[in-house]
Regions:
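Non-catalytic structural scaffold of enzyme domains
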Residues: 1-235
């Protein structure tokens, strides 16, 4: 395909920065290319100043909408956002930019469904859990979450990763959270925060681990190379 026929991808990033860099690396790795010009054009706003997506009234939605509008103005034709929780603002982002957004929550839920699971364990913050509960329920699946005290411990683990700690003890902590979900009846796991796969791989857990960020990178390549259709544009 001629580079002129490819779609330009706009990335709303920085939530967190390491997860965005990981996403961009996957995007590059999954693009078949013999030369630089074969790669997808990507316009990224890596904005770690976006307000906390879990804090009501933080203004995160308006900041994300502004970022999306700027990406459109810079030439983006389709959007991706490697942050699960920020998808709570997906409709606002699409309306503000006039661009379709490739939905990583939908990709994660659909992957779990295709594996035949009925009970899905999600390693995510409260915002991500809410989103996945809705998307899974739409597919007649139920979400398995950590008990309150361990959910707090998970958040502590998550912020260690955000602070740059990718050590073995952090991996062991994340394995412990994953094992608790298995014991509570989960049949498959979803990495519901993009930091989780930075320390946890499929071989680290006893259940299959769905990585929505990886699925998002693969779908972005497929859409931008026109192997798959664009998502529905906002009304």
């Amino acid at each position: 395909m001629s580079p002129d026929e490819q779609l330009v991808l706009g990335v709303l990033g920085g939530m967190g920065p390491a997860a965005t860099v990981d996403f961009l690396a996957r995007l590059q790795a999954y693009t078949p290319a013999d030369r630089d010009q074969d790669h997808i054009r990507v316009i990224a706003d890596i904005n770690p100043k976006a307000p906390d997506r879990n804090t009501p009234g933080s203004g995160a939605g308006s900041v994300l909408a502004e970022m999306a509008g700027a990406l459109h103005g810079a030439g983006a034709e389709v959007l991706a956002m490697p942050c699960n929780t920020a998808h709570a603002h997906a409709d606002l982002i699409q309306r503000a930019s006039g661009l379709p957004l490739i939905d990583m929550i939908d990709l994660g839920a659909e992957a779990a469904s295709q594996k035949g699971a009925m009970r899905v364990g999600v390693l995510g913050d409260k915002g991500a859990l809410k989103l996945y509960r809705e998307y899974l329920a739409a597919r007649a699946m139920s979400l398995v979450s950590l008990p309150p005290e361990q959910q707090e411990a998970f958040m502590f683990t998550l912020y260690r990763i955000k602070a740059g700690d990718l050590g073995d003890d952090v991996t062991r902590e994340m394995q412990r959270h994953a094992e608790e979900l298995r014991k509570r009846g989960a049949e498959v796991l979803i990495a519901g925060c993009t930091e989780v796969p930075l320390v946890l791989e499929n071989e680290d857990v006893k259940l299959e681990l769905v990585d929505p960020g990886d699925l998002l990178a693969r779908r972005c390549v497929a859409v931008c190379l026109r192997w798959e259709p664009l998502p529905h544009a906002p009304a």
